[in-house]
Every structure is written in structure tokens, then in C-alpha cells.
Amino acid sequence: MKRMLQVCLPLLILLIAVRVVGAQEIIDRIVARVENDIILLSDIRELARYQLFAEGKSEPDDQVLNRLVDQWIVRNEAKLALFPQPKPEDVERSLARLKRTFSSPEEFEERKKQSGLSDDDMVRLLKSQLYLSNYLDTRFRPSIQIDDNAIEEFYKTRVVPRAEQRKQTPPTLDSARDFIQEALVQRAINQEADKWLKESRSRLHVQLFLNENSQ
């Protein structure tokens, strides 16, 4: 009984935790349990803000929650494998690449302001995403093989039509080969990761509570 009280008390505190924003009360609550860990509504809100910042839009809450469950799986496997955190210089390079996706430094700052993320939040979340993607890359890239036929097909169906749409001269196949190969490798990594995540998730105890007692 004492052990049960010790376990339940922290959960009770989490369930009734309240943050005040302006005149509104936002109740932070448990929205999922994965094995012995929990995911909070505030975790959904934070990842959604990062999506808004990095991509210009965020997914619905249920999709964000599923991403958080997937991230739990990847992070747990990476930790078990003692996979190293990204180096500071790798985080800086990733941040520089992200900044280049914006038309100007002003647009970057404006989007960050709209998302409500602080500089520290942004770097922390970027580092977390980089850690997960690095692990998936290391896990699946060695087994992926891309043949010449796949490269030529991608060139004919994706590269050439896209250039023509923009009224540009398409690059030669040879000059685009490395870019195409990496694009196909990334697509294959995503496919293998999706398959692995579905298989891994089926073996875990996952409970979703997002739509229960919603405000």
C-alpha cells in the first residue's frame, strides 16, 4: 500500500498541475503512457511549437502525440546502444542549415517569435531532433543499397519535370547523381524506420489519453 501511494502521488501532482497564462488556466495532464514513462500535454505543445517554427505549420495534437511516442522508442533504443549526443559543432551546423531555409534573418526571428520558443528551447529541441535522426541514420544507412535504375528513374520523374516547371535547364544526370542518391537513401531510411517503429510499438505497452477528459 505504501509503495502504491509513492507511485500514485507524483502522478496525482502531475495531473492537477496548473499553469496560469493571462486570465486562462491551462491544465497540464498526462496524455500517454509508454511502458513506465509518461507524456504530458505540455510535451505536445512544445513539439507543435517547434514544428510551427521549423516548418511553418504544426500537426494536429493526435499526430504530434504519435510522433512523441515514436521519439520515445528511438530515444530509448539510442540510449540502450549508448549512442553519443551530437557534438556542439554539429548542432551549430544543423542550426545554420535551418536558418538557410528562411528567406532572411528577419523571417527566422519572426517565425521564432510566433512559435513562442526561446533561443534555449530552440537549440535544445534542435539537438534532440538531431540526436534521433543521427541514430536512425546510423542504424539503417549501412543496409541500404541504391541501384543505377532507381537513380535514373528519379532523375526522369522528379528532377527533370521539376526543372521544366521552373522553366530551368535540367542538370545532367551525372551532376545530379550524388544528390539523387542521397535523396533515395533518406527515403529508404524513412521507410525502414517506419517499419521498425511499427514493429517496436506493437511490443510495447502504450496507452493514449489525449481525448479523455479533454478541456
Which residue ranges define each predicted feature?
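Bacterial N-terminal signal peptides
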Residues: C8-A17
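Residues in and immediately flanking transmembrane alpha helices
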Residues: I16-R19, A48, G56, D194-K195, ...
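Boundary at the C-terminal end of the N-terminal hydrophobic targeting segment
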Residues: V20-E25
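N-terminal targeting signals for Sec/Tat export/insertion, comprising classic cleavable signal peptides
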Residues: I30-P60
